[in-house]
From Swiss-Prot:
Family: Belongs to the succinylarginine dihydrolase family.
GO biological process entries: arginine catabolic process to glutamate; arginine catabolic process to succinate
MF-aspect GO terms: N-succinylarginine dihydrolase activity
Source organism of this protein record: Salmonella paratyphi A (strain AKU_12601)
Entry protein name: N-succinylarginine dihydrolase
Residues where substrate binds: 19-28, 110, 137-138, 212, 250, 359
Taxonomy of the source species: Bacteria, Pseudomonadati, Pseudomonadota, Gammaproteobacteria, Enterobacterales
Disulfide bonding pattern of the chain: none
Domain of life: Bacteria
InterPro entries from the UniProt entry: AstB_sf (IPR037031), SuccinylArg_d-Hdrlase_AstB (IPR007079)
Keyword Iron-sulfur: no
EC number: 3.5.3.23
UniProt xrefs under HAMAP family: AstB
Keywords on record: Arginine metabolism, Hydrolase
Record note on quaternary structure: Homodimer.
Amino acid sequence: MTAHEVNFDGLVGLTHHYAGLSFGNEASTRHRFQVSNPRLAVKQGLLKMKALADAGFPQAVIPPHERPFIPALRQLGFTGSDEQILDKVARQAPRWLSSVSSASPMWVANAATVCPSADALDGKVHLTVANLNNKFHRALEAPVTEALLRAIFRDESQFSVHSALPQVALLGDEGAANHNRLGGEYGSAGVQLFVYGREEENEIRPARYPARQSREASEAVARLNQVNPQQVIFAQQNPEVIDQGVFHNDVIAVSNRQVLFCHEAAFARQKVLINQLRTRVDGFMAIEVPAGEVSVSDAVAPYLFNSQLLSRDDGSMLLVLPRECQDHAGVWRYLNKLVAEDNPISAMQVFDLRESMANGGGPACLRLRVVLTEEERRAVNPAVMMNDALFTALNAWADRYYRDRLTAADLADPLLLREGREALDVLTRLLDLGSVYPFQQTGAADG
């Protein structure tokens, strides 16, 4: 059956700021306390979406979350009106204010893991929400992510959205950032590669930074998504690269159809994995970047592998890269050599995503890939699909509500909270989502 990959990109939230919340993500740590520009951030993301949509790659949007997230502060024991809580936490525990104000939901590669209908035992598209429990600011996301996905993939005859796994370390799940699908045509059955960093009773794990994904979680997600057991491979990421800042697999590898583009040090027992894939995937091609040409640190710094690999109508592939790759002499030299060689990657497109990149999220972090047949695509909420009208409307919306300068101190401003809620209220109407945010369901009561 004919199917296409649709990229659902996250909209950057109104409280996008640099707080260094993500230990193990070196870009996040390096840019802590810099002044951010939320309006520029959301527009950089929109420009990427629109350019790719105009080039024939189907695009859609996933909205940001409510931030600052007052219910989480109430859970932590702060009381009073919303405004009083903001004032208290800013004075007593500013780190918590930064955490509940994180715009990290924009990196929707961590929103869920997706199984196309061609791979599912019941013939439906499955999405399992990620619990993201390694980081407090990200562990807040799952309930609203689930509500948003249900509002977008609302036809239960075509889609099954599953709640996140229990919030325990044993079941740490980071979503599609640790998942690859390989195969031929999108509409044909493929092989799903689940990548984990640790498993219980296995001492092979990183020493410096946490391994966020467990094998136990990956296996549970595969079951929830009803992936045909004959179409699954579980592989461990090389713990040594996790300790060099590769906190998700999409920082060291990217796949599309029959191609796996990765660093030669990406996986533990990489030769065994490559041979497995070669046996299971017709026409499989591994493009392994040698450390002698690009070191792991040189690949991580400009996010070489946090790129998008997209199929064009003629069968060739386009590599979508952050501008930082072009600015890195060694990486850019390697890439120009790559596209000149005999392989499916024949073109590159560079985007300025500086605001997201400084927090540790490149092109691949910003998108959730969903393979859909034409019938399934018609069943998606049409209001989220990117086109000229939506691009214009979202830019006008951003101009109205987003600030062009934000510091950690600004997060305590009650006006920022009100601006955000008003903006999301307008956005849910624009995207026909219904009442998906807690403040909409409670009337934003001060109690």
